[in-house]
Amino acid sequence: MLIPILLCLASLGAEPVKLRYPEKHSLLVVFDAKGDIVPVRSAQDWAMRRSHILNSMHEVMGPLPTKKVPLDVKVLEETAKEKYTLKKITYASEEGDRVPAYLLIPHKIVGKVPAMLCLHQTTSIGKGEPAGLGGLPNLHYAHELALRGYIALAPDYPSFGDYQYDFKKSKHASGTIKGVWNHICAVDLLCAMESVDKEKIGVIGHSLGGHNSLFVAAFDERIKAVVTSCGFTSFPRYYNGNIKGWTSDRYMPRLATVYKLKTEYVPFDFPEILGTIAPRGLFINAPMEDSNFEVVGVKECVAAAQGVFRLLNSRTGMQAYYPECKHDFPNEIRRIAYDWLAKAFEN
């Protein structure tokens, strides 16, 4: 089965990775030095499989930049709220590119505290929604986390909010990898803050922010806890395998230009991404009636990845909730998620 997939990709003009896993839900297997698929029996075995997954993601998304620039954080506005200070800032992610963001800092900080990267959904106001300045109240999670004592950073995704960005002129292979890089730089910003506990940094996001939370956590292991809401299903379950929605400039154009919208050609899938996060904590909100991300596919992804969390003896593990609602992050599930975060960050 493996060889035909490689041949098909070669005929499409792709440059496939050497190791192609035919079954993306079978995570506890790995190619050995001889090129044979063998069981994953140890953390070392999994580290090899994980590296193959990240390479496959790069094949679709493109590479990350190899050089960082100084963050050069600039504060544009500062507003004193009842329990925190809201700063409108920008930070540099690349030469000539600055990311607008809101930084929420609780008033009464003693010592070092946890910090959360808060990623917005598809909305014109971008970062303003998680910061509590508009949009849907159920998605004001940066505001709510700041009230709970977290430092919260909510950046704009390229082309949303105040972030003007021309994907056509971008040097990146995908909007997705540009977003990942911006979010890695956001973690750099949090790590540079004296009041942030660098061992207690997490990420939370809904929809667009839900899958971007997974993507950045896959590539940045400084992120110790992930909360993803309405962010994924397996590619074959996404609109019955019609993955065109993933192919815009904001996402991964190669899914169309190289892989011709054929899910069987795509070298990675979401069960594998979930696995890359282990042994760190992962909290999933996947509503039963989410028309964007079909819940059966979510459950299949979760079932496939659980073995990795067990293999690595994850202290926090992976928890998934399936509320009876549509594409939403309900009050009760957010409360459970926040309680879960508090436990994940316990010493």
Sequence positions of predicted segments:
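N-terminal pre-domain segments of enzymes
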Residues: G13-P63
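Sec-dependent N-terminal signal peptides
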Residues: M1-A10
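N-terminal cap/lid segment of alpha/beta-hydrolase-fold proteins
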Residues: S51, E59-G111, A115
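Mobile cap/lid helix-loop segments that gate and shape the active-site cleft of serine hydrolases
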Residues: T228-I273, P279, E294-V302, R310-S314
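Conserved strand-to-loop "acid loop" that flanks and positions the catalytic carboxylate
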Residues: A278-V295, E324
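Cap/lid segment of the alpha/beta-hydrolase catalytic domain
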Residues: G111-S195, F219, Y239-N240, K244
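C-terminal catalytic histidine-bearing segment of alpha/beta-hydrolase fold enzymes
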Residues: V302-N347
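Primarily recognizes the serine-hydrolase "nucleophile elbow" in alpha/beta-hydrolase
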Residues: R148, C185-T257
